């Protein structure tokens, strides 16, 4: 069995050292070991476990989606203002500005996943071939093949959402060829659908989100993937399968991201420091004051939510707040209406005075957490440039004095997303009434309880309501940037704008001055070519049947 070094694989792919065909070449393995593995179900399960470590790469705790940090940092939602770490602070800004870094080679380094993903596809196909040659019962073969095909479907989904086309390989290893053309986009999505349908039909039905994959996980991924190819009937079909499985929204929004008592999670990946599977999300994004209060050097706050995102949240009674008073470059002493905003705001964003770890957040100049001006102030480390910090997904109980590694789970799929996927498919089928009903299910979570939507009677109005709900409900779950791309609105929404924050100064007593500031040195820019990422040069060098996409030539 090979040892898995996924970080090394990503680095190698990012540096252009590998092509997919290098990974797909069949190399010698220990035949005795492989034979033993596929002669026993329990050891075969251990072999399949290899792929589970890739599930978190769907989301925000790793750098698979973007080697330079959260993809939200490429949008109006999040600002990387900390200059301590070049790749995770400077680079996302350059990508969002479409700076000189957006050559085909550098785009592949920071956004591409070609080489590492094809390596995993090759390994899945090898495993399926060995499984088919085993003497396992039909039931065990079907279950293990379903797990493997879930992963293959997941890998091809990640390729197609970036490149629109892929080279399709299956478990017939004789088809591997150094020179092989890209298959059509339609063929690629049909292949993803086939794998995920098989997985959904053959994995066990269970609401246990921990451990091995379930039918619900397969259908959840299917509902997400089919949005990208606009197969609305299959989105609805996948969602409806999940609706009958017994998942429920957690009453408290923040509980949807926790391990215990989570009725909403369809699949979560759990970390364990003993098994050395922790992550660094808290170290990167916790408020800077958390580190100093633990007796450490100021750190954290690599990126922070923007004022633009804050203004997306509704009042607890419904409708948007009027932020005109705080859109002043002269400054105002009036406190922002944080206490009037809906519960999801309080569960997602830390603001001036927010309760946190037995203290209150101080994102003001010379506060415990601090404020700094983007690209102007020295030693920004740990300080916010927007006046906010991220709360969602950050572990309030993490002890930095004990460990820099964190263990809160990554919830890969949850019911609220499925409701919104279903709503989108319904409105695309002109069923506005059902679409609005499922958006309202999310809005009326017991602990959120926003008013039902009113006067949303057209497809266009329902789509705007859906866009708002996805932006708020699914914030920082790694979906917003890709939503803008698949809707073909990124070029419009992410061009010619700048992100904003609040500069906060403590005055006398408990009074503060809030000043509206721009936190970008230039406009954001999403060039049309970014709707499809470039083929890596390493692939072009070795595969004579592939040409670079026209927009990247």
What annotation goes with each model-predicted range?
Residues 17-19:
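C-terminal motif of bacterial Sec signal peptides marking the signal peptidase cleavage site
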Residues 21-87, 197-198, 216-373, 494-496:
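An aromatic- and glycine-enriched ligand-binding surface/loop that stacks and positions planar moieties
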Residues 40-49, 53-59, 84-163, 179-187, ...:
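Conserved, well-structured interaction surfaces
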Residues 83, 117-118, 191, 257-322, ...:
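Long, intrinsically disordered, low-complexity segments
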């Amino acid at each position: 069995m090979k040892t898995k070094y996924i970080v090394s694989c990503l680095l190698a792919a990012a540096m252009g050292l590998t092509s997919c065909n290098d990974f797909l070449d069949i190399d010698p393995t220990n035949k005795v070991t492989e034979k033993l593995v596929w002669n026993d179900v329990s050891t075969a399960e251990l072999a399949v476990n290899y792929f589970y470590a890739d599930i978190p790469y769907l989301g925000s705790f790793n750098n698979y989606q973007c080697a330079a940090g959260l993809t939200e940092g490429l949008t109006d939602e999040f600002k990387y203002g900390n200059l301590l770490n070049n790749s995770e602070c400077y680079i996302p800004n350059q990508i969002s500005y479409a700076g000189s870094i957006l050559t085909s080679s550098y785009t592949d380094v920071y956004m591409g996943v070609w080489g590492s993903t094809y390596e995993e596809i090759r390994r899945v196909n090898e495993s399926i071939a060995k499984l088919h040659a085993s003497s396992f019962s039909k039931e065990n073969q079907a279950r293990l093949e379903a797990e493997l095909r879930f992963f293959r479907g997941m890998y091809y989904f990640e390729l197609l959402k970036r490149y629109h086309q892929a080279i399709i390989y299956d478990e017939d290893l004789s088809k591997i060829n150094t020179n092989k053309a890209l298959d059509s986009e339609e063929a690629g999505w049909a292949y993803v659908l086939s794998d995920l349908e098989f997985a959904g039909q053959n994995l066990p039905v269970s609401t246990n989100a921990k451990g091995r994959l379930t039918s619900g996980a397969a259908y959840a991924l299917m509902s997400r993937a089919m949005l990208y190819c606009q197969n609305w009937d299959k989105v609805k079909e996948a969602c409806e399968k999940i609706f009958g499985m017994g998942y429920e929204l957690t009453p408290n929004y923040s509980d949807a991201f926790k391990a215990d008592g989570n009725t909403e999670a369809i699949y979560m990946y759990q970390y364990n420091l003993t098994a050395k599977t922790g992550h660094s999300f808290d170290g990167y994004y916790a408020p800077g004051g958390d580190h100093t209060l633990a007796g450490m050097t100021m750190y954290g706050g690599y990126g922070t939510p923007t004022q633009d995102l804050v203004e997306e949240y509704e009042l607890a009674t419904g409708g948007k707040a009027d932020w005109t008073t705080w859109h002043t470059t002269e400054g105002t002493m009036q406190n922002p209406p944080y206490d009037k905003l809906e519960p999801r705001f309080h569960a997602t964003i830390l603001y001036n005075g927010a309760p946190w770890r037995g203290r209150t957040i101080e994102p003001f100049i010379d506060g415990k957490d601090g404020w700094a001006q983007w690209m102007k102030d020295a030693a920004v480390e740990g300080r916010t440039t927007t006046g906010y910090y991220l709360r969602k997904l950050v572990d309030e109980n993490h002890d930095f004095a004990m460990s820099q590694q964190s263990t809160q789970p990554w919830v890969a799929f949850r019911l609220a997303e499925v409701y919104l996927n279903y709503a989108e498919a319904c409105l695309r089928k002109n069923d506005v009434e059902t679409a609005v009903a499922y958006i309202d299910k999310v809005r009326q979570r017991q602990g959120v309880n926003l008013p039902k939507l009113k006067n949303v009677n057209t497809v266009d109005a329902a789509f705007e309501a859906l866009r708002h709900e996805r932006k708020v409900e699914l914030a920082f779950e790694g979906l917003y940037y890709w939503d803008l791309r698949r809707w073909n609105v990124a070029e419009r929404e992410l061009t010619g704008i700048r992100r904003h924050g609040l500069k906060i100064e403590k005055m006398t007593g408990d009074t503060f001055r809030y000043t509206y500031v721009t936190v970008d040195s230039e406009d954001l820019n999403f060039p049309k070519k970014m709707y499809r990422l470039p083929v890596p040069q390493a692939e072009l060098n070795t595969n004579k049947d592939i040409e670079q996409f026209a927009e990247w030539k």
